[in-house]
Amino acid sequence: MQLILTTGGTGVALRDVTPEAVREIAIRELPGFGEIMRIESMKITKNAILSRNLAAIVDKALVICLPGKPSGAVECLSFVAGAIPHCIEVLQEVPTSC
């Protein structure tokens, strides 16, 4: 498995524990993904500042934690989609030009 997407559990409610669960098994966090998802989402809703979206490496897989609202998940994924192929290539040790 090279890419794992989660939806939901990234808000501020006490039941929202997805980021903590992923951090427990991650070997590295990729803060840029969460930063971009929040920055771009802020253009749509000011409540995006409450989001705890993140991306991390688990084994050799990229895990991206998206919001639970379907439209928010699609939007957030679109904000980071351009970086996903390169990240997966690096994790899978595919030779690249950079």
Question: How does the language model describe each region?
Answer:
Residues 1-98:
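Non-catalytic beta/alpha edge segments that cap or flank active sites
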